[in-house]
Amino acid sequence: MQPDKIDWKIINQLSKHNETNTTIANDLGVSEGMIRQRIKKLQDAGIVKIRALRNPEVLENQQLAMVAVNIAEPRLLESKARDILKIKNVLSVSILSGQYDLIIEVLVDSNTGLIKFISKQLSGIGGITKTETFVTLKSFNKWV
């Protein structure tokens, strides 16, 4: 399935404003039922996912960090990325160009939680030759 113009308008409104189906329908001049059906089709096609997001800036015990990683064997990048993504509290994993192979976005409850993530969970993956951790001190409009 390839999204048409209306689908893209729906996707954009959901992405930027998290609008209700009724609000989107009113903005586009179509029925709420049509919006609901299109969102369902977009979800079924794996194009969109609807979920609740947290703002770590306003929640206690929420530490956002990025962990840059190098992998011993470049041919295993995708496999290692998928393995890392299975670890609890990992929000995303991306393959990079440049100094590091992967960047991991992780949300933990404390510095102790970050240490546990790096020393126990991430080290359990194997084949990781280097890590560098970047702790987020303040985010602007970051929802996870």
What do these predicted regions represent?
Residues 1-144:
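A compositional/biophysical signature of low hydrophobicity enriched in polar/charged and small residues
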